[in-house]
Amino acid sequence: MVKIILNSFLFWGGWIIIPFIMEIVPALGSVFLLIRRNLRHKLHKKELEVYPEITLIIPVYNSADTLYGCIRSINDSTYPNDRIRIFLVNNKGKDNSFDIYAQCQQEFPELLMQWMNSEQGKSRALNLALYNSDGKYIINLDSDGMLEKNALVNMITRFENDTAINCMTGSILTVPEQIKKYKAGPSRLLRELEFMEYAQAFLAGRSYASELNSVYTLSGAFSAFRKSAVLKSWMYNTDT
């Protein structure tokens, strides 16, 4: 009887203790490190008096349904519009994305935007825009993404406050307001789980990895680079 109880205790204890050690303890540790990091950054953060010119590169491929929201989010950001230049690089798209671009030119005249056509794939399209850019910093943004209003200011401020940083990636989240449009059920639950997955990956996982200087990949949907560093690299690999 004692042996059965002991075996049961070890079995169920393993199911409780192992996840606690492997998941909960590191999670608590990461929360502590992130709080400490945020406090440290706030204490040493110096607000910018002059905003450097930045270049946003938006690859476009049949993006008519999302492109307007993407460009509007840039226009509505707190970064000065006259310090932003946008390259929209069309990669053999067949829809009316250009019409959306033309509409945005009319509605957001303060934004300097340029449409470029590339017939040789996304990587060559990105390299083409890089070579034609003038900004001190290069930011890649997917055409189905929408910026949080302070995202650009926060990112460039961090760059300017730490010259050792040559690249960084932003947090990618789905939009909670859009999830609420779905009725309760499997479809909405799936999107809620997706939001939690993104939140865990970016707000906790990558932030913790950043604190340990161990981020090994950047999100293609929203990443930024110091142009002087990028031009010393091999640029985007055109074989992929």
Regions found by a protein language model. Give the residues of each.
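A conserved acidic beta->alpha catalytic loop
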Residues: 90-99, 118-120
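Acidic helix N-cap motif at the loop->helix transition within catalytic regions
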Residues: 68, 95-103, 150
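Long helical/loop segments within the catalytic core of UDP-sugar-dependent glycosyltransferases
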Residues: 108, 124-125, 156-239
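Short aromatic/hydrophobic "clamp" motif used to bind/position activated sugar donors
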Residues: 138
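N-terminal membrane-anchoring/stem segments of glycan-assembly enzymes
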Residues: 1-50
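Acidic donor-binding/catalytic loop of UDP-sugar-dependent glycosyltransferases
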Residues: 96, 145-158
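Short, acidic, metal-binding catalytic loop of nucleotide-sugar glycosyltransferases
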Residues: 72-83
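Cell-envelope/extracellular polymer assembly enzymes that use nucleotide-activated donors
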Residues: 52-55, 85
